[in-house]
Amino acid sequence: MAMLVDPPNGIRQEGKHYYTMWQTLFEIDTKYVPIKPIGRGAYGVVCSSINSETNERVAIKKIHNVFENRIDALRTLRELKLLRHVRHENVISLKDVMLPTHRYSFRDVYLVYELMDSDLNQIIKSSQSLSDDHCKYFLFQLLRGLKYLHSANILHRDLKPGNLLVNANCDLKICDFGLARTYEQFMTEYVVTRWYRAPELLLCCDNYGTSIDVWSVGCIFAEILGRKPIFPGTECLNQLKLIINVVGSQQDWDLQFIDNQKARRFIKSLPFSKGTHFSHIYPHANPLAIDLLQRMLVFDPTKRISVSDALLHPYMEGLLEPECNPSENVPVSSLEIDENMEGDMIREMMWEEMLHYLPRA
């Protein structure tokens, strides 16, 4: 539980109060009353809280010492900039960002999100049974949120069960946009947790697009159906071997997208595999679910189904409401970030983002 404590240096900053949870100090705005810690990661700790002004339950994420690692600081800045613009019921809402006391020396960042009960990773690992309707509804919402992002010119690039938050009503929201990019931005840094990484990323292809997110969705959907990862590779080459074992060896024309000759030779050197039909891996799944999965987990990204077409697949019949799928453009220029920025400039840009959350006079 959250424990109210005195400020560490004995000096109480105006408008702030202090709590400890899981041996972590939270210096937060007085309108937020913490309840209990609900998650921990490399970034820090997340706690549930109540906004005493609105009575709304929220999640507060403390990112500790954010400038210790420049790449992590860039990820945080990217999430701040993106979530200020996106508005969709299947994308997590950033409700507030607490303004630090010291503009030029703050180290910790506190982000306030809408509160969700769990995430898809926890649900998959639980003993809770999942009906075909559950599977379909989770997939529908994921595709729906992704269609919105893609229509706004945004690739998520790190979709996995742990980044899909779920509440007791089975409502699903996509979160963690630290790796998201617009199409135009050249990308060299690490993308997508290995098990959910598309072949074109594993093969170091430079020219990739929305299909990388579709592959990740396919891996997630397979994991929902089978309650375990479909391609749990130990490293990149092993990951490719696991994929070929399932989808089968590829013809030359299916490898045209690989712009690296060495990578193409590696794929062609793998032992022949005729593949395994998904209906054999998931014998109890709805045949229409298997058909859609087959269209998402296609090795050649140019032949992979699009998000829009996946939403129109017969498996989704009865769920799609066209008027509920807005196509909105996020201002691309606002998401462009200089990857070579140093800490002081990142700190200043974060401060400017935080100012957008100050109450209007």
Curated annotation (Swiss-Prot):
PROSITE patterns linked: MAPK, PROTEIN_KINASE_ATP, PROTEIN_KINASE_DOM, PROTEIN_KINASE_ST
Motif mapping: TXY: 188-190
Organism field: Arabidopsis thaliana
Catalytic machinery residues: D158 (proton acceptor)
Protein name: Mitogen-activated protein kinase 14
Modification Phosphotyrosine, positions: Y190
Subunit structure: Interacts with MKK3.
Reactions mediated catalytically: L-seryl-[protein] + ATP = O-phospho-L-seryl-[protein] + ADP + H(+); L-threonyl-[protein] + ATP = O-phospho-L-threonyl-[protein] + ADP + H(+)
EC number(s) given by UniProt: 2.7.11.24
